[in-house]
């Protein structure tokens, strides 16, 4: 409580690392008596503005990292934050610059990192919000909105298919549902799987993790277990879903590998769960599935941290290295041929490959080419 005309430069807010008030400053002003302080309400708006300004000043005072990797990680974090704050027109224009295919039926974009496909709690802007604007950019002001044909996780980059007509979108969705679409992903994993090629065929179910932080995760629900050297069938959860993933190591070093993943089924977080819990090779930057009991930044070995030029305390900003690199659609009409769509990985993905000593196959993508579409990070 402060009397009119009394400035309180020492006011600070306690709670969440900020301060609530300085009594010494409050009583050091002769005009700021206790009676006057009790008579007027505090201007909450001015206090909030002051706190925001102080917080912004603290951010600007933080020294810029000299390490190029840490600098790029910070830039990526800021880029994803900006994606949630930009005007829908700006986001739609950025997506239009990342188009990899367009015809009378479909539009295919290279989805950037950190952008959700659908809305939800805490989501300020998503791809579905800007589809009407994107359609107008491509086909003029009278264009009807584009339609989503499938989804990718917020942290996953790469091929994403949109349709001009709702009927075509339903047709493509049915192709996904009946597993007629061939999907290929690239993933950088922590450690190298053994064997280097194979199939992970383990059902997946969602469960609550009983740790310090109660949360839900997808996890394995095996149909068999080993008992005295023998494989014994077990009763699986009624909620478990069939999940099958083909994988192959494309390049490897002592501590990491580049994998090509081909999901045969399409279960939520299937690739992340199979890599982490099935092969014990979590995807680089997967802070959710690197540990079952905790929600914590991924813990990396000293060797990987050294190659990436990161400290463990900064690992929480490391993005998920999972990229939808290729998608093959069957012919939508009898007179047409199947459509194979390719997307180059984002810049941070290519940089991590180089630092970890991993090679990107030249038959699909050239490492010497520009790593990302215009506007992608």
From Swiss-Prot:
<dbReference type="InterPro" id="IPR050188">
    <property type="entry name" value="RluA_PseudoU_synthase"/>
</dbReference>
<comment type="similarity">
    <text>Belongs to the pseudouridine synthase RluA family.</text>
</comment>
<comment type="subunit">
    <text>Interacts with 16S mt-rRNA, mt-tRNA(Phe) and mt-tRNA(Met). Forms a regulatory protein-RNA complex, consisting of RCC1L, NGRN, RPUSD3, RPUSD4, TRUB2, FASTKD2 and 16S mt-rRNA.</text>
</comment>
<dbReference type="GO" id="GO:0005634">
    <property type="term" value="C:nucleus"/>
</dbReference>
<feature type="region of interest" description="Disordered">
    <location>
        <begin position="51"/>
        <end position="70"/>
    </location>
</feature>
<dbReference type="GO" id="GO:0008033">
    <property type="term" value="P:tRNA processing"/>
</dbReference>
<keyword id="KW-0508">mRNA splicing</keyword>
<protein>
    <recommendedName>
        <fullName>Pseudouridylate synthase RPUSD4, mitochondrial</fullName>
        <ecNumber>5.4.99.-</ecNumber>
    </recommendedName>
</protein>
<dbReference type="InterPro" id="IPR020103">
    <property type="entry name" value="PsdUridine_synth_cat_dom_sf"/>
</dbReference>
<dbReference type="Pfam" id="PF00849">
    <property type="entry name" value="PseudoU_synth_2"/>
</dbReference>
<comment type="function">
    <text>Catalyzes uridine to pseudouridine isomerization (pseudouridylation) of different mitochondrial RNA substrates. Acts on position 1397 in 16S mitochondrial ribosomal RNA (16S mt-rRNA). This modification is required for the assembly of 16S mt-rRNA into a functional mitochondrial ribosome. As a component of a functional protein-RNA module, consisting of RCC1L, NGRN, RPUSD3, RPUSD4, TRUB2, FASTKD2 and 16S mt-rRNA, controls 16S mt-rRNA abundance and is required for intra-mitochondrial translation. Acts on position 39 in mitochondrial tRNA(Phe).</text>
</comment>
<keyword id="KW-0963">Cytoplasm</keyword>
<dbReference type="GO" id="GO:0003723">
    <property type="term" value="F:RNA binding"/>
</dbReference>
<dbReference type="InterPro" id="IPR006145">
    <property type="entry name" value="PsdUridine_synth_RsuA/RluA"/>
</dbReference>
<keyword id="KW-0496">Mitochondrion</keyword>
<dbReference type="GO" id="GO:0070131">
    <property type="term" value="P:positive regulation of mitochondrial translation"/>
</dbReference>
<dbReference type="GO" id="GO:0006397">
    <property type="term" value="P:mRNA processing"/>
</dbReference>
<keyword id="KW-0698">rRNA processing</keyword>
<dbReference type="GO" id="GO:0006364">
    <property type="term" value="P:rRNA processing"/>
</dbReference>
<keyword id="KW-0413">Isomerase</keyword>
<keyword id="KW-0809">Transit peptide</keyword>
<keyword id="KW-0819">tRNA processing</keyword>
<dbReference type="GO" id="GO:0008380">
    <property type="term" value="P:RNA splicing"/>
</dbReference>
<dbReference type="GO" id="GO:0005759">
    <property type="term" value="C:mitochondrial matrix"/>
</dbReference>
<feature type="active site">
    <location>
        <position position="153"/>
    </location>
</feature>
<keyword id="KW-0539">Nucleus</keyword>
<dbReference type="GO" id="GO:0106029">
    <property type="term" value="F:tRNA pseudouridine synthase activity"/>
</dbReference>
<dbReference type="GO" id="GO:0001522">
    <property type="term" value="P:pseudouridine synthesis"/>
</dbReference>
<dbReference type="InterPro" id="IPR006224">
    <property type="entry name" value="PsdUridine_synth_RluA-like_CS"/>
</dbReference>
<keyword id="KW-0507">mRNA processing</keyword>
């Amino acid at each position: 409580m402060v009397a009119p005309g009394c400035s309180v430069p020492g006011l600070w807010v306690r709670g969440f690392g900020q301060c609530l008030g300085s009594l010494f400053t409050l009583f050091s002003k002769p005009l700021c008596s206790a009676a006057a302080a009790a008579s007027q309400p505090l201007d909450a708006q001015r206090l909030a503005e002051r706190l925001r300004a102080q917080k912004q000043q603290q951010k600007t005072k933080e020294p810029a990292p000299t390490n190029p990797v840490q600098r790029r990680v910070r830039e990526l974090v800021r880029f994803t934050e900006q994606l949630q704050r930009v005007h829908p027109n700006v986001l739609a224009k950025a997506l239009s610059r990342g188009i990899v295919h367009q015809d009378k039926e479909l539009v295919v974009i290279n989805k950037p990192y950190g952008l959700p496909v659908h809305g939800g709690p805490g989501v300020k802007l998503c791809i579905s919000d800007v589809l009407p604007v994107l359609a107008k950019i491509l086909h003029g002001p009278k264009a009807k909105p584009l339609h989503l044909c499938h989804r990718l996780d917020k942290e996953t980059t790469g091929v994403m298919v949109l349709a001009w007509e709702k009927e075509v979108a339903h047709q493509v969705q049915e192709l996904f549902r009946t597993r007629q679409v061939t999907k290929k992903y690239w993933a950088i994993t922590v450690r190298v799987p053994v064997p280097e090629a194979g199939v992970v065929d383990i059902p997946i179910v969602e469960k609550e993790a009983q740790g310090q932080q109660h949360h839900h995760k997808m996890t394995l629900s095996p149909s068999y277990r080993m008992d005295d050297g023998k494989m014994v069938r077990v009763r699986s959860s009624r909620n478990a879903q069939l999940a099958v993933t083909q994988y192959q190591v494309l390049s490897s070093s002592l501590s990491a590998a580049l994998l090509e993943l081909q999901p045969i089924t399409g279960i939520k977080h299937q690739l992340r769960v199979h890599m982490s819990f099935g092969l014990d090779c979590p995807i680089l930057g997967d802070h959710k599935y690197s540990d079952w009991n905790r929600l914590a930044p991924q813990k990396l070995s000293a060797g990987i941290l050294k190659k990436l030029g990161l400290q463990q305390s900064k690992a929480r900003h490391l993005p998920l290295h999972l990229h939808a690199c290729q998608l093959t659609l069957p012919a939508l009409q009898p007179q047409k041929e199947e459509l194979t769509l390719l997307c180059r990985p984002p810049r941070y993905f290519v940089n991590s490959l180089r630092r970890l000593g991993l090679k990107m196959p030249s038959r699909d993508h050239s490492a010497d080419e520009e790593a990302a579409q215009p506007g992608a990070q």
